[in-house]
UniProtKB/Swiss-Prot annotation:
Source species of the chain: Zymomonas mobilis subsp. mobilis (strain ATCC 31821 / ZM4 / CP4)
The protein's name in its UniProt record: UDP-N-acetylglucosamine 1-carboxyvinyltransferase
UniProt-listed InterPro entries: Enolpyruvate_Tfrase_dom, Enolpyruvate_Tfrase_sf, MurA_subfamily, RNA3'P_cycl/enolpyr_Trfase_a/b, UDP_GlcNAc_COvinyl_MurA
Source taxonomy: Bacteria, Pseudomonadati, Pseudomonadota, Alphaproteobacteria, Sphingomonadales
Enzyme class: transferase
Binding residues for phosphoenolpyruvate: K22, N23
Entry function: Cell wall formation. Adds enolpyruvyl to UDP-N-acetylglucosamine.
NCBIfam families for the chain: murA, PRK09369.1
Length: 426
């Protein structure tokens, strides 16, 4: 099994290109099920989760063709064509690899009137129940049955019908499933307390390019006017705000100066506020966001929250950065339980962190030391990379398959800005 070896103490300096957003593309790809025409997504990241999504869509009858992007967008593009649906069953052996597989449920149900999807796998972060997804589809008339580890959903005669969906708590995935189901439902659907994340906006923009009628994009109340059919489109995947924030933390902890090429400030406003508060110099430039660490890091008090609040997906990376900040930091995780699994590994490297319930108290230390550490989930693994970049000596991060789910060409990007990092097989 691969591991990543890092020799810390090198200041990061240069440009890091930000890839297409993982959390956006994993909703955009299932949207191809909503039309028999082709959907082309530009700025496709090279990630294990993208490969898993391709495998699942192929199983359902979607043809996928990946090519090098043309024009102004570097990297890859994918064309997905679901001219016929070969199966409405998303099997366990594929779905278990990736939680986002549940996002085929809404599109399949909307187009075919039925869907059977295995309960999902993916990150080991709390329970992440899918009950909000199911309640949303029931509000559109679906009949839902849970049996033998599968969700079986069936639309009423004549297909899904518009309705009112009111989420008791904000859920990104449930909002995405509800939107994709509603665009082909008969009549009008109102979604109250919808998630407002930039990835939701990106999905809506793609669906509208395909002919969907959605009002209120970017707000917590969406009104969707169902269509008989959608057509094909070409859409550019938004830049990954979590990847950009992660590399900002890496620049900060190494005293670096890095331009996050392609990052959009509007997508990560609260992260930038906290980075500035920690003592970093942040400037928005024509082609990205520049992060300069020209002063000692300062401790922070922050809580995770749905967008536009501080993202839970950045909590672990900030914790690693704050391990070397002056003073005491207090982090409160309000979104997921059990999202402090990286703490014991950071402590092995010399961090002073105490966790009580949903609150973590980080007392800044003068230095970290390299160690062998184990990644437990996607963002936790990145926190260990960040800590290792500043640690004295060598760190080996095991179970790096977690990183491959969400960070494209990690070693290549960090090496290009001065990190001593390599992937070791076996």
């Amino acid at each position: 099994m691969d591991r990543i070896k890092i020799r810390g103490g090198h200041r990061l300096k240069g440009r890091i290109p930000v890839s297409g957003a993982k959390n956006a593309v994993l909703a955009l790809m299932p949207a191809s099920l909503l039309t028999s025409d082709s959907l082309t997504l530009i700025n496709l990241p090279r990630l294990a989760d993208v490969d898993s999504c391709c495998h699942l869509l192929n199983e359902l009858g979607v043809s996928t063709m990946v090519a090098r992007s043309k024009g102004d967008h570097p990297g890859r593009e994918i064309t997905l064509t679901a001219d016929t649906i070969a199966s409405t069953v998303a099997p366990y052996d594929i779905v278990r690899k990736m939680r986002a597989s549940i996002l085929v449920l809404g599109p399949l149900l909307a187009r075919e009137g039925e869907a059977t999807v295995s309960l999902p796998g993916g990150c080991a972060i709390g329970n992440r129940p899918i009950d909000l997804h199911l309640r949303a589809l029931e509000a559109l008339g679906a009949e839902i049955e849970l049996t033998a580890g599968y969700v079986r959903a069936r639309a009423p005669d004549g297909g899904l019908r518009g309705g009112i969906i009111s989420f008791p708590v904000v859920s990104v995935g449930a909002t995405e499933n509800a939107i994709m189901a509603a665009v082909l439902a008969r009549g009008e659907t109102v979604i109250n307390n919808a998630a407002r994340e930039p990835e939701i906006v990106d999905l809506c923009q793609c669906l509208m390019a395909m002919g969907a009628k959605i009002d209120g994009v970017g707000n917590s109340r969406l009104v969707i006017h169902g269509c008989d059919r959608l057509h094909g489109a070409t859409h550019v995947v938004m830049p990954d705000r979590i990847e950009a924030g992660s590399y900002a933390c890496a620049a900060a902890i190494t005293g670096g100066d890095v331009l996050l090429q392609g990052a959009r400030s509007a997508d990560m406003a609260e992260v930038l506020v906290e980075l500035k508060e920690s003592g970093l110099n942040i400037s928005v430039e024509e082609d990205g966001i520049r992060v300069q660490a020209d002063a000692p890091l300062k401790g922070l008090t922050l809580s995770t929250a749905p967008f536009p609040g501080f993202p839970t997906d950045m909590q672990a990376q900030f914790m690693a950065m704050l391990a070397l900040a002056q003073g005491t930091s207090v982090l409160t995780e309000t979104i997921f339980e059990n999202r402090y699994m990286h703490v014991p590994e950071l402590v092995r490297m010399g961090a002073d962190i105490q966790v009580k319930g949903r609150v973590a108290v980080v007392k800044g230390v003068s230095g970290l030391v390299g160690a062998e550490v184990m990644a437990t989930d996607l963002r936790a693994s990145m926190s260990l990379i960040i800590a290792a970049l500043a640690a004295e000596g060598e760190t080996q991060v095991h179970r790096v398959y977690h990183l491959d789910r969400g960070y494209e060409r990690l070693e290549e990007k960090l090496s290009a800005v001065g990190a001593d990092i390599e992937r070791v097989g076996g």
